[in-house]
């Protein structure tokens, strides 16, 4: 499944799908760009994985609602429930281990 961009109109719907990795990022954040490449590589390796990205600059209300205070922040959801989170860039194996 391709990496999907989320916004306030579809975020809650997207995180309700089975297991989802949500990447909260900022437009000018250099570490976010590095992590984006890591997610692209993981998606290529595991194409059935649900990965969504939410731009916190363009969607500050969603970022506030989910307690995002720094980027990148990665949330892991199972059937809409937060099961794990991480602030900062994660190494590929750490993402896969969740």
Could you tell me what each predicted segment is?
Residues 29-32:
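Short cysteine clusters
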